[in-house]
């Protein structure tokens, strides 16, 4: 089932690495009740598109941080996240989902195809979750180069609503 705007955000529990969470602390969706929350799902640490997306978010961190809590989510390990954060100076935390529970619950673990070969992977998607823990916006299949602009616009729209 594909999530829609207005749906309750699926509950999650994971280990957050980076930002105020340091080398890793448990977090869950309910920790963010009363706050705007952005979960951006990306395929893999330290690949060209994902690095571009993360570094663009890093470069606009002040603007984003003033409007919402932000977490990147991928199926990479916490150790992989630590290396990615250090290598690129990312100021925001990343959630590790090696068992693919969060990506499946959010409907972003999908069949993909490259050079005729089918495989499963994470669809680059961002969910903006309101203070009531309901989904207020979804940016699906975003291109890394456009992500920050689309996210900033969506957050401004939420602030004006």
Functional labels for PLM-detected ranges:
Residues 1-161:
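Chalcogenol-based redox active-site neighborhoods
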